[in-house]
Amino acid sequence: MLLSLTHPSFLAMLPMLLMSNLLQWEGVTSASIHHIEDDYGEAYLKDLFDQAIKLSNDTMALTIEMRMIFFSDGFSSNMFRKIVLDFLKDHKHMIETLNSCHTFSLSVPETLEEARKISLEDFLKIIVSILNSWNKPLYHLETELHCMKGAPDAILIRANAIRTLNRELLETILMILSRVHPGMEENTDYPLWTDLASLQATNKERQFFALYKLFYCLRVDTFTVDHYLKYLMCMLYSDDICTSVKFYEDP
């Protein structure tokens, strides 16, 4: 990841990155962008980015909706509120939990200068790693929710939709990457999710805690991917999206 969206320096750095987009990627990256435009068609590549951003927006919106349902539906609201209250009583436990998302193991640049050195190809690889890392969690999420007594249709339908959107977004990013770097093999090295045992636990508190953490981490990563895509779109095309991107911390 460029930087975790929960990291303060990420929030401070990205607006500067967007404002200085015309000064960035002037060397190798600018050459690669012109190569893409000449050989593959700028319009088609932009269409792929537009499609990716739409899929990303839909995924983020559904994730927010689903998290809100978990807090409001009788199926899960009491458990989720208890988790929040327990966090308020034990800040150390809260920080440890919310900093243990499986994708947080990805390397990140620490400075603006390091971020400027990230190529278009490497940004796309980061997005692929994030999306790949969610394939198994989203599969098991949908499976386990169907086995949980009282899980409402509103949650089940959205779980399926998010999994489908994640797969479609991954396919779209791979199409973009194949045009940026033709013939490149897909990287299968991505962060592994290790909370399956907790999600399948017979102890309800443990199981719902796994659900809470999963949706917190999913919320962070859908936000991350969405902003990376808008950042790349701004870098490549300098269009209206540069002024439409907003940065804020997950509530």
From Swiss-Prot:
Subcellular location: Secreted
Domain of life, source organism: Eukaryota
Gene Ontology cellular component list: extracellular region
Gene3D superfamilies per UniProt: 1.20.1250.10
One GO MF term attached to the UniProt entry: hormone activity
Disulfide bonds: C101-C217, C234-C242
Entry comment describing in which tissues the protein is expressed: Expressed exclusively in the placenta. Expressed in spongiotrophoblast cells and trophoblast giant cells of the junctional zone and in labyrinthine trophoblast.
Name of this protein: Prolactin-7C1
Gene designation: Prl7c1
